[in-house]
Amino acid sequence: QAEIIDQLVRLFAHGTWGDYKCNASRIPQLSPDQILKQLTVLTLAESNKKWADNMSEIDKKEAEEGVEELK
């Protein structure tokens, strides 16, 4: 499970459309809201914010709730 999330985050951070198409069967389908939240977390992570701060930016009260939503 953690490996799948790691692949997804790496794809969002460094991947291309072609990378997504090649890996689409190995990563979970995301809704438009989940995609925007993934991109938001990556943008915030660049500024070295704490995980809890990142989760509050996407309206998550608990860090674990945020992880579940991003899956």
From Swiss-Prot:
Compartments reported by the entry: Cytoplasm; Nucleus
An annotated GO BP: red, far-red light phototransduction
GO CC annotation terms, alphabetical: COP9 signalosome; cytoplasm
PTM annotation, UniProt: Phosphorylated.
Keyword terms, alphabetized: Cytoplasm, Developmental protein, Nucleus, Phosphoprotein, Phytochrome signaling pathway, Signalosome
Major location category of this protein: cytoplasm
Assembly description: Component of the CSN complex, probably composed of CSN1, CSN2, CSN3, CSN4, CSN5 (CSN5A or CSN5B), CSN6 (CSN6A or CSN6B), CSN7 and CSN8.
Function: Component of the COP9 signalosome complex (CSN), a complex involved in various cellular and developmental processes such as photomorphogenesis and auxin and jasmonate responses. The CSN complex is an essential regulator of the ubiquitin (Ubl) conjugation pathway by mediating the deneddylation of the cullin subunits of SCF-type E3 ligase complexes, leading to decrease the Ubl ligase activity of SCF. It is involved in repression of photomorphogenesis in darkness by regulating the activity of COP1-containing Ubl ligase complexes.
Family that this chain belongs to: Belongs to the CSN7/EIF3M family. CSN7 subfamily.
Protein name per its UniProtKB record: COP9 signalosome complex subunit 7
